[in-house]
Amino acid sequence: MTASHHPGNHEQISRREAMRRGVCGAAGMIAAGSVASRVLAAPAEKTPEQVAAELKKTRDEAAKAKAKAKKVQTKSVIQVFLWGGMSHNDTWDPKPGTGYDYLGEFDKFIPTNVNGIQLGALLPNLAKQADKYSLIRSMTHGNNGHETAAYLMQTGHLPGGRLAYPAVGAIFTFFKKDQYKGLLPPYVVMLEAAGRFSEEGFLGPAYKPFATGGDPNAPRFEVQGIVNRGIDDGRQKARRELVDKVNLFGYGLADVPEMAAAETARQNAYGLILGKGREVFNLESEPTELRDRYGRNTFGQECLAARRMVEAGVPYITISFPGGWDTHSNHFATMRNQCASLDQGLATLLGDLKDRGLLESTLVWCTGEFGRTPKVSWEPPWNGGRHHHGDVFTVLVAGGGFVGGRVVGSSDEKGEKVKERPVYPADLLGSMYLLAGIDASAKLPHPWGLDAYVLDTENEGMKAAGLLEELM
């Protein structure tokens, strides 16, 4: 299931053989110049860089052929963002036998419903759904800073310069804007944007995600800054009518892009509260048993709300996991608490999407900006913590054209470095764009008229090892 390549496996030439060939070559020049020319012009052994480039090209071509053959494209994306960086060794990429300094308290591992795939014991529900998702165990970018790593994972571009590139959600919104005619905003974040993972970048405010605020686990979904606690619908409608009457200044500047974007945002907000779009967030209409299965907590109900948004056709939904994963200290207690709701909510979401026939056209991906150090820091002030680790970590992908039940790549015996088949941000995002019918080489409108593309690894010096043809 893993793709491996060993650039050192070329024909080995001994010193004696090299000397023999040199003598024969010299004799050939005397005897027949044309033959000597052909010998001297023979291609040299390929460098590791050349081998890697050829392998990338092969993967890219295979992925494009497989994506073209698929009957269904990605229509919606649900991104579960684990801000802070979740430990890969304790969850998706367990390392039995590495000892207490690496395992700590989490020395139990469980099989999944797919032969050969094992998870940490913190994820029992997701272990039963492994046939629905695949794991990329060789994700890497090598950066250990929160903001920079999040930017890499969300844009596929190197940070730097005066303008930020748009995140993947903004890219989806830009390319799907003519196809989506729903009442809800096309790019929704629950509950708040965290860090640089949902930027509109230089595309402008029209592609900024709508952050819902509030709490879908509460009896009434409240949009921060628009609906205040205790204000009923009648009063809210009266407020809107009053604003419309006195907004003469705004109407006079309707052609100004910034004012038009602000008005669009305001109308979107009212659509959530007073229009049919509000019903999407009325989770009380769901069966009690199903709500319980998702988990009666914020993350579980976010997952349920995300499924309802998919049914409404929203192109891109981000769930920013409530509470962080930045476990420099108190790691083991935090992981137990966080993984309980992650395991329940995400497993139920995948099963629910599958049962409703939505998983094939809905791409789900779950990751933080990086993983965490495999070796535990027991000394003060950490007292059992794991730190930032961008050298290798794991990403879960499901649906939207990705097949389930597979593992791509591997980390080394302790989960510290990539062992086989590195996957870089551009490889992951490029694969997602491909499955959604988005041309990753397409040019984007830049406010300064500069050349800017969805992805541009060669000109930026970004690493790439090839699209994820193994999962298509």
Task: Enumerate the predicted regions with their spans.
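Ligand-binding pockets and gating/stacking loops
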Residues: M1-M472
